[in-house]
Swiss-Prot record:
It comes from Kluyveromyces lactis (strain ATCC 8585 / CBS 2359 / DSM 70799 / NBRC 1267 / NRRL Y-1140 / WM37) (Yeast). One of its GO terms (molecular function) is structural constituent of ribosome. This is Small ribosomal subunit protein uS14. The keyword Ribosomal protein applies. Keywords: Ribonucleoprotein, Ribosomal protein.
Length: 56
């Protein structure tokens, strides 16, 4: 079995490896609440466009 066939052959059905940010594709710092699936950095950039506002 060559290396090309083995690389990323393990199924990613659950866990952190199965989910990624819908904007940047990152796996770290994901916000899954309300079905957002956006990482922290992208959320801070796009929060106002989505409809999240700070009341301070």
């Amino acid at each position: 079995m060559a290396h090309e066939n083995v690389w990323y052959s393990h199924p990613r059905k659950f866990g952190k490896g199965s989910r990624q940010c819908r904007i940047s594709g990152s796996h770290s710092g994901l916000i899954r609440k309300y079905g957002l699936n956006i990482d922290r950095q992208s959320f801070r950039e796009k929060a106002n466009d989505i409809g999240f506002y700070k009341y301070r």
